[in-house]
């Protein structure tokens, strides 16, 4: 029998390739790995898109057209980034559903770190959604950020602060782009914490069988 705890204390990188779990888990446990693949794809494609993107209300839409038409393989990067975002959320909701079904929420540290990840991911997705700054994204930014005005006393002040003025304008797009660029690095950090916390104890045992048979 392998003593995983001793091995984990030998080198911190062992946390990423040694998970004390037997063959009694199902295919539903693949979605965590798929999420890491999505995160890697989004980070790489997002970096190349950011190189050519212009965070200006007069040039943002034109820069997207420039990326898809003029930049070599830019259309692949743009489409992969857009479709990858949808795949990201499909995987994460399946990942959450599996956790709810099999009672993974009982592992509180892992579950709370995952919940934090979801909140940061949703914020990142929203900031990214408005970046093309076409008619739809401009409207979405106005409608969704206006929800802050529902907060008693502080609503109007918070909305004005987020917009960078009395209406959505160039400062809004600039800060949305800055936030969309920096938040993925926070997601990567939180993902590392999530993985370390998970590998510290191992996965749950949905079938209730002996996990030492391997």
UniProtKB/Swiss-Prot annotation:
Its cofactor is heme b. It comes from Cerastes cerastes. GO terms for molecular function: metal ion binding; ubiquinol-cytochrome-c reductase activity. One of its GO terms (cellular component) is mitochondrial inner membrane. Belongs to the cytochrome b family. Heme b b562 binds at residues 81, 180. Heme 1 (or BL or b562) is low-potential and absorbs at about 562 nm, and heme 2 (or BH or b566) is high-potential and absorbs at about 566 nm. Binds 2 heme b groups non-covalently. GO terms for biological process: mitochondrial electron transport, ubiquinol to cytochrome c. The lineage of its organism: Eukaryota, Metazoa, Chordata, Craniata, Vertebrata. The cytochrome bc1 complex contains 3 respiratory subunits (MT-CYB, CYC1 and UQCRFS1), 2 core proteins (UQCRC1 and UQCRC2) and probably 6 low-molecular weight proteins. The chain crosses the membrane at residues 31-51, 75-96, 111-131, 176-196. This is Cytochrome b. It is a multi-pass membrane protein. A ubiquinone binds at residue 199. Coiled coil: none annotated. Keywords: Electron transport, Heme, Iron, Membrane, Metal-binding, Mitochondrion, Mitochondrion inner membrane, Respiratory chain, Transmembrane, Transmembrane helix, Transport, Ubiquinone. Heme b b566 binds at residues 95, 194. It is found in: Mitochondrion inner membrane.
């Amino acid at each position: 029998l392998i003593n995983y705890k001793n091995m984990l204390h030998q080198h911190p990188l062992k946390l990423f390739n040694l998970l004390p779990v037997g063959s009694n888990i199902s295919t539903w446990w693949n979605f965590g790995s798929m999420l890491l693949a999505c995160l890697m794809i989004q980070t790489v494609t997002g970096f190349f898109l950011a190189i050519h993107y212009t965070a200006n209300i007069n040039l943002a839409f034109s820069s997207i057209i420039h990326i898809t038409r003029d930049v070599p393989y830019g259309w692949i990067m743009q489409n992969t980034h857009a479709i990858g975002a949808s795949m990201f959320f499909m995987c994460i909701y399946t990942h959450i559903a599996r956790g709810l079904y099999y009672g993974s929420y009982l592992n509180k540290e892992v579950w709370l770190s995952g919940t934090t990840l979801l909140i940061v991911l949703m914020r990142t997705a929203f900031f990214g959604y408005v970046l093309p700054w076409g008619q739809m994204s401009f409207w979405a930014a106005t409608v969704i950020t206006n929800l802050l005005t529902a907060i008693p006393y502080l609503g109007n002040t918070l909305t004005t602060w987020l917009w960078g003025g009395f209406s959505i304008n160039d400062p809004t797009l600039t800060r949305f782009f800055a936030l969309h660029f920096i938040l993925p690095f926070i997601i990567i950090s939180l993902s590392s914490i999530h993985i370390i916390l998970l590998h510290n104890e191992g996965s749950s045992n949905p079938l209730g069988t002996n996990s030492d048979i391997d």
